[in-house]
Amino acid sequence: METSKRNISFGRSIYINLGEQVVTQVLEEMKAVRQTVAFTSFQLPEHPLEISDMARLVELARSYEVDLIPDIAHKDLTKENIAALKKAGLSYLRLDEFGDEAFIERCGKAFTLVVNASTFTHREYKLLERLGFSRQIIACHNYYPKVYSGISLEKFTTINQKLHALGVKVLAFIPGDEPLRGPLHEGLPTVETHRTLDTRLAICAHPVGTQC
């Protein structure tokens, strides 16, 4: 899938609270198999982050030729922080919620926007279209830590069909393998029926893989 910089097919998730040694190991593994994009979250209640922490992780990932797609709290996306993350080399930004038009325009000029596939509305799409960002956006589903909280395959397919009709590329999550992220350690899938599947089987079972 072509974006502004990368061809995304498969990626990984990395989390700064796992420690730099674990993060570096994952990045080394990604570089070895030419994976170029990783999801991360900068919204970690158990591990509050400063903008300098976020920028350092972006720079570390870039040193392994990996671009991050970070989930960042709206309050942390000040003009100064956007500039700092852009300077560190950040290319993508996941927006869980839309702010006002000026905020969206500021973010869209700095980064390729990654919207929440589950909540993205046609009105939001038209706003991005008017601002000139609709051709470069990506939609990313949520992952669901709790057993039975993931969405059904039917809902997943319906959402994807609507997004594909708009020309929007879609990303989603498979459960992952060891070490599973805490505190529940139940995997982080988008589709509930994928939760107990082996990683390779989950990849093969994922309809997104044949449509993006």
Regions found by a protein language model. Give the residues of each.
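Catalytic alpha/beta core domains of metabolic enzymes, predominantly
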Residues: 116-212
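Short, small-residue-enriched loops and turns at beta-alpha junctions
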Residues: 44-48, 74-77, 121-122, 145-148
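Glycine-rich, proline-tolerant flexible connector loops at the mouths of alpha/beta enzymes
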Residues: 36-56
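Active-site mouth loops of central-metabolism enzymes
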Residues: 6-23, 68-77, 185-196
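Short beta->alpha connector loops
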Residues: 18-21, 73-77, 96-101, 117-123
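Acidic (Asp/Glu)-rich catalytic clusters
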Residues: 27-34, 52-65, 83-89, 104-110, ...
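Short, acidic/polar
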Residues: 17-31, 77-85, 125, 199-203
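Hydrophobic faces of well-ordered beta-strands that scaffold small-molecule active sites
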Residues: 6-16, 37-40, 66-73, 91-95, ...
